[in-house]
Amino acid sequence: MRRHLSLVLGSLVIGLALLIAPGASWAYPFWAQQNYDSPREATGKIVCANCHIAKKLTQAEVPQSVLPDSVFTASVKVPYEEGIKEIGADGSEVQLQVGAVVMLPDGFTLAPQDRWTDEIKEETEGVYFTQYSDEQPNILLVGPIPGDQNQEIVFPVLSPDPATDSNIHFGKYQIHVGGNRGRGQVYPTGEKSNNTVFTAPAEGKVASIDAGDNGASVVTIQAADGTSTSETIPVGPQLLVNVGDSVAAGDAITNDPNVGGFGQVDAEIVLQNPVRIYGLLAFFAAVAIAQIMLVLKKRQIEKVQAAEGNF
């Protein structure tokens, strides 16, 4: 019941947002939160890719190792060509929005703000972080936010301490990262957005191109047997066909207006036991002392040999 209520309220919020700002370039993580218990499927695919079909590069930078109960940053880069714009929901050109999801290992969470350094505060200015769910504080989301200012998104992370949580162990862990720029090509309902290419539903000739609702175009294709099939093209994509053109099923009848895309990448991080570090430092110190002693002993022997040679 609670899940359905959240879905209804969320849908109302999105509907109002689209009415108020129809030209915005939305990339809602809301859909993933409402439709999937986890943002990562058993196959390893992050579910954002179900709507953001186009693939683009995403990069992640994390420390090689961290100590328990320490604050570090995970950086997600969602690069794209500066100045580029995309088609908004109303067909107008809008700035790209970006977003990111970081799936941290269990126990790792968003660092509390009172432990952020001045550098972290500067890097995260204007960025709002949310948890995927109350039960999954290790999965962090950002977006949509303006892409022209945030092609690199920095996540402040707090590492767990095995000394205070018996479920946490020292060792190597994986971090799963997803980054997106721009709107999706498919809605969660399965319908195409106006940010994708439209194809001919059947083979035949374009019989008519009529004006539809809200600036859409209705392309009617008549097959050789006389049957007709229509495809509604929303405002945004540009038609590539004219009345009388012959098309095959699956042929593109519009351009592809999409300029964005989604990408995912995995990274590794080691939760390091400080005792091992101290032991390693002690080992290095012992080796250094042993080498110094060997050098001193060698010089002592050389002096003795030199003294014996004088007699």
From Swiss-Prot:
The annotated topology with respect to the bilayer is: Single-pass membrane protein
The record's InterPro entries line, in alphabetical order, gives:
Cyt-f_TM, Cyt_f, Cyt_f_lg_dom, Cyt_f_lg_dom_sf, Rudment_hybrid_motif
The free-text function statement in the UniProt record for this protein reads: Component of the cytochrome b6-f complex, which mediates electron transfer between photosystem II (PSII) and photosystem I (PSI), cyclic electron flow around PSI, and state transitions.
What Pfam families has UniProt attached to this entry?
Answer: Apocytochr_F_C, Apocytochr_F_N
Compartment list: Cellular thylakoid membrane
Which ranges does the record mark as transmembrane? 277-297
Which GO MF terms does the UniProt record name? Answer: electron transfer activity; heme binding; iron ion binding
- The protein's name in its UniProt record: Cytochrome f
Which residues take part in binding heme? 28, 48, 51-52
Gene behind this protein = petA
What biological processes does GO assign it?
A: photosynthesis
Q: Which domain of life is it from?
A: Bacteria
How does this protein assemble? Answer: The 4 large subunits of the cytochrome b6-f complex are cytochrome b6, subunit IV (17 kDa polypeptide, PetD), cytochrome f and the Rieske protein, while the 4 small subunits are PetG, PetL, PetM and PetN. The complex functions as a dimer.
Q: Which NCBIfam families match?
A: PRK02693.1 (NF002736)
Extract one GO cellular component term from the record.
plasma membrane-derived thylakoid membrane
The taxonomy runs: Bacteria, Bacillati, Cyanobacteriota, Cyanophyceae, Synechococcales
Q: Alphabetically list the UniProt keywords.
A: Electron transport, Heme, Iron, Membrane, Metal-binding, Photosynthesis, Signal, Thylakoid, Transmembrane, Transmembrane helix, Transport
- Tell me the first and last residues of the signal peptide: 1-27
Q: Which cofactor does it need?
A: heme
What is the free-text note on the cofactor? Binds 1 heme group covalently.
